C-alpha cells in the first residue's frame, strides 16, 4: 500500500537533506556570492563556463534545490490526496511546500538584493522545518500502510507540553547557531569552556556575545533533553517508541555538542565538522517534531 508514495517520500527526504547539507556547505565556504548577484542565472549564464569552486558549490546548490522543490510539491499533493484521512497530513503538506518555496525566495533575495544576518539566519531554520515536514509526511505514508504501527501513546498534559516546548526551543537553538555562522562569530571565542581564556569575557563585543548566546542556548538544550530522557524512561517506559526517541535525542545532542566544541578547538579548520554539526541538529529537530506528532494524537490526561 502506498508503495510509490513511500518511495517518493524517502527520495524527497534524502533530497531535502542534501539541500540542507549543501546550504551548510555554501555558508561554511562563503560561496553565497559564487554566482554573483544574478538569480536564477549564474553570472548571467544558464550554465556557468569554467567556474571556480565557489561557483560550483553555489550553482549545484541552486540546481539541486530546484529539483527537490518540485519533488516536495509533488509529495505534498500526493499525500494530500492519498492520506487526507490522517489528521496531520494537510498541515504537514502545507508546511512542506510553504517552507521550501519561502526558503528559496529568501535565498534568491539574498543574492539579488542582499539581506541582514538576522534574516539570513532564518534560511537554515526554514530548511530544517522543510526537512522535518517531509520526513513526517513520509512517516505517515509508512504508518498508513501498516495501521498496527500508528503509534499514539497516552501521556500526561505536562509531558505533552514539555515535549512541545523542547521542540520549539530546539528551533531557537538552531537559529542562534545559524546566526553565529552568518555573523562570522564561529571563532569569536577560542577554547572551550573558556572564551579567550576567560570565564567572563566582554559580552558586549558583538561576535563574542553572539558566540556565548549560542553556547548558552546549546547547553540549555542539552539539559532540557536530559530531563526529557529521564522523564520518559521513568514514567513512560511502556511506550517503547517514546523511549527510543528520547534516547536517540540524547545521543544526537551529545554528538551535536561534541562536534560544536571540535569546531572551536580545531579553529574551524575541518569543513566536515561544521557540516556534521548542521546535520545533527537538523536530525534532532526532526526527531523532536516526530515526538510532538506522537504525543498530540491522544487527548492528554
UniProtKB/Swiss-Prot annotation:
Protein name: Heme A synthase
Pfam family, one: COX15-CtaA
HAMAP family tied to this protein: HemeA_synth_type1
Location(s) in or outside the cell: Cell membrane
Residues that hold heme o according to the record: 61, 123
Record-annotated disulphide pairs: 35-42, 189-195
Ranges facing Cytoplasmic side: 1-7, 78-92, 139-159, 237-240, 296-301
Residue numbers annotated as active site: 58
E.C. numbers: 1.17.99.9
Reaction catalysed by this enzyme: Fe(II)-heme o + 2 A + H2O = Fe(II)-heme a + 2 AH2
Lineage: Bacteria, Bacillati, Bacillota, Bacilli, Bacillales
Binding annotation for heme b: 214, 277
Segments in the Extracellular topological domain: 29-56, 114-117, 181-215, 262-274
Domain of life: Bacteria
Amino acid at each position: 500500500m502506498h508503495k510509490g508514495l513511500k518511495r517518493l517520500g524517502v527520495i524527497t527526504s534524502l533530497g531535502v537533506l542534501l539541500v540542507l547539507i549543501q546550504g551548510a556547505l555554501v555558508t561554511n565556504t562563503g560561496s553565497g556570492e559564487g554566482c554573483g548577484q544574478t538569480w536564477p542565472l549564474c553570472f548571467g549564464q544558464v550554465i556557468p563556463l569554467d567556474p571556480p569552486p565557489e561557483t560550483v558549490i553555489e550553482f549545484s546548490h541552486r540546481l539541486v534545490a530546484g529539483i527537490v522543490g518540485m519533488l516536495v510539491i509533488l509529495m505534498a499533493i500526493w499525500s494530500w490526496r492519498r492520506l487526507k484521512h490522517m489528521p496531520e497530513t494537510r498541515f504537514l503538506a502545507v508546511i512542506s511546500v510553504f517552507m521550501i518555496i519561502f526558503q528559496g525566495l529568501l535565498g534568491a533575495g539574498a543574492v539579488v538584493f542582499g539581506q541582514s544576518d538576522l534574516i539570513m539566519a532564518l534560511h537554515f531554520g526554514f530548511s530544517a522545518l522543510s526537512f522535518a515536514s517531509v520526513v513526517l509526511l513520509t512517516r505517515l505514508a509508512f504508518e498508513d500502510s501498516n495501521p498496527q504501527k500508528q503509534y499514539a501513546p497516552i501521556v500526561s498534559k505536562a509531558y505533552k507540553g514539555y515535549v512541545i516546548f523542547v521542540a520549539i526551543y530546539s528551533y531557537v537553538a538552531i537559529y542562534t547557531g545559524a546566526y553565529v555562522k552568518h555573523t562570522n562569530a564561529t571563532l569569536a571565542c577560542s577554547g572551550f569552556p573558556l572564551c579567550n581564556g576567560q570565564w567572563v569575557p566582554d559580552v558586549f563585543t558583538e561576535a563574542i556575545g553572539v558566540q556565548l548566546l549560542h553556547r548558552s542556548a546549546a547547553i540549555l538544550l542539552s539539559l532540557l533533553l536530559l530531563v526529557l530522557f529521564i522523564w520518559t524512561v521513568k514514567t513512560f517506559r511502556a511506550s517503547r517508541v517514546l523511549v527510543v526517541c528520547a534516547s536517540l535525542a540524547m545521543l544526537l545532542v551529545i554528538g551535536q555538542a561534541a562536534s560544536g566544541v571540535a569546531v572551536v578547538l580545531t579553529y574551524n579548520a575541518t569543513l566536515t565538522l561544521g557540516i556534521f554539526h548542521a546535520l545533527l541538529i537538523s536530525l534532532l529537530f526532526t526527531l523532536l517534531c516526530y515526538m510532538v506528532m506522537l504525543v498530540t494524537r491522544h487527548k492528554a490526561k
